A protein has these predicted regions:
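Short glycine/acidic-rich loop motifs that flank beta-strands on beta-rich extracellular proteins
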Residues: 36, 56-59, 138-140, 154, ...
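Short "repeat-start/strand-capping" segments in structured domains, especially the N-termini
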Residues: 41-43, 144-146, 182, 213-216, ...
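Solenoidal tandem-repeat scaffolds enriched in leucines and small polar residues
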Residues: 246-247, 265-267, 271-274, 278-295, ...
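Intrinsically disordered, low-complexity Ser/Thr- and acidic-rich flexible linkers and loops
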Residues: 107, 237-243, 297-308, 336-339
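Right-handed parallel beta-helix/beta-spiral solenoid domain characteristic of secreted/periplasmic
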Residues: 48-63, 70-78, 82-117, 149-206
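Conserved small/polar residues in nucleotide/adenosyl-binding loops
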Residues: 384-388
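N-terminal extracellular ligand-recognition/capping segment immediately after the signal peptide
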Residues: 9-13, 23-59, 116-167, 191
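Feature marks extracellular polysaccharide-active and adherence modules
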Residues: 29, 50, 131, 151-153, ...
């Protein structure tokens, strides 16, 4: 426990001078205006918000700072947080999120306040819980870090970017700065992209991107109307004898609907499990598959043992329907320099393909078991190295 308890006020004394003790508990009972200044919190301090206490109008730099508060606004929407922060649970209401987004019945944006700054602030914490609402984001590419849990509380996140290549949430890639990111859980929210509103045609605006990381669980999510994929997994970061593959990813009870390119794409990964997911209504730009397992067509001949592959992917109890392309497309590439297939060990069990199909080629060891494949005029089952 902190040896010192300091009450912070908007007194004549500068705010920074009131934050001058490491490992102290600072009690904030009233509105603190930082007057557009940068204020650094001493190392290991605790900010305890009580009554109507909140901080506004400036930049607050944490230093292993813990926040304690009831479910009230404690950081106004004109606060920028930097540095390192923690809380037992960080609630979205702390950060002045505005749940005023209005969309029509198809998900098209009508109006709403931008919550991009609030999202950047809350993502500095590890354990996030959103109050159920409909939130609008004008910007995107929100970076997630290791050891993070995001519980959306059944909220809707509506994002609207004018860029041709972006994603709503990104794991493992901060605009080219690669970093292995591990132990992440995302659950209980819906992402709605701007496929219906935008006249900018692209295939690279994804709901969630897992570029590089391990031990990642997505559960009870919906990702739809993105101008790329609902979920993208993969990268082309190559080094000899170093594995940069996203790995050990579980996708459970998720729905990928009405996306522009694919419901989900895997271009590089090892150990991915889809359980109880739906891939539906993909339409826009080829391949337009429900799920596409397809390495990018790049030259890996200069690298030894670069681990560029799609391997050990399991699809169980999933549903594929009404995709303009294949239900499941597995498109292998040529063998690597060691003569090995780079798409290996694909297992499909107890799944339904309604007005869809499975197309697979250029791979080794694919097993399809106990599936219903209800094809239409487009449907077929074509394969290479497939055991059914």
């Amino acid at each position: 426990s902190q040896a010192n308890i300091v009450f912070v006020t908007n007194s004549i004394q500068p705010i920074q001078k009131q934050f001058n003790l490491s490992y102290a508990k600072y009690v904030i009972k009233s509105n603190i205006n930082l007057m557009s200044q940068n204020v650094v919190i001493p190392e290991g301090a605790v900010l305890c918000f009580v009554d109507s206490g909140r901080i506004e109008n400036g930049t607050l730099i944490g230093n292993g700072t813990k926040v304690m508060a009831q479910q009230n606004v404690v950081f106004s929407d004109n606060i920028l947080l930097k540095g390192s922060w923690k809380a037992d649970t960080a609630y979205s209401i702390w950060f002045d999120f505005k749940s005023d987004c209005i969309v029509d019945s198809s998900g098209r944006f009508i109006s709403g306040s931008d919550n991009s700054q609030q999202m950047n602030n809350i993502l500095l914490f590890d354990n996030l819980l959103f109050n159920c609402g409909v939130y609008y984001f004008k910007h995107a590419n929100f970076q997630l870090h290791s050891d993070m849990i995001i519980d959306g509380g059944n909220s809707v996140f509506k994002w609207n970017t004018s860029l041709k290549a972006d994603c709503f949430m990104a794991i493992g890639d901060s605009r080219g700065k690669w970093a292995g990111t591990s132990n992440i859980q995302l659950k209980n929210f819906t992402i709605i992209g701007n496929k219906l509103e935008s006249d900018i045609k692209t295939e690279q605006c994804h709901g969630i991107c897992i570029r590089y990381g391990s031990n990642i669980i997505l559960s009870n999510l919906q990702s739809g109307f993105n101008r790329g994929d609902g979920l993208y997994i993969g990268n082309v970061y190559l080094e000899s004898n170093i594995d940069h593959s996203p790995s050990y990813i579980s996708v459970i009870n998720c729905i990928f609907s009405d996306n522009h390119r694919q419901g989900s794409s895997i271009t590089r990964a090892n150990h991915v499990d889809f359980l109880g997911c739906k891939f539906i209504n993909t339409n826009g730009t080829p391949p337009q598959a429900g799920l596409d397992i397809e390495p990018n067509d790049i030259n890996i001949s200069a690298y030894e043992n670069c681990y560029y592959a799609c391997e050990n992917i399991r699809i169980n109890n999933c549903f594929f329907s009404n995709n303009a392309g294949n239900g499941l497309l597995v498109a292998g590439r040529s063998k690597n320099r060691e003569g090995k297939y780079i798409v290996n060990n694909i297992f499909v069990n107890n799944s339904v393909f309604d007005r869809g199909n499975i197309r697979a080629f250029g791979l080794k060891n694919m097993q399809v078991k106990d599936c219903d494949i209800l094809t239409d005029s487009y449907g077929s089952v074509s394969y290479t190295h497939l055991r059914a």
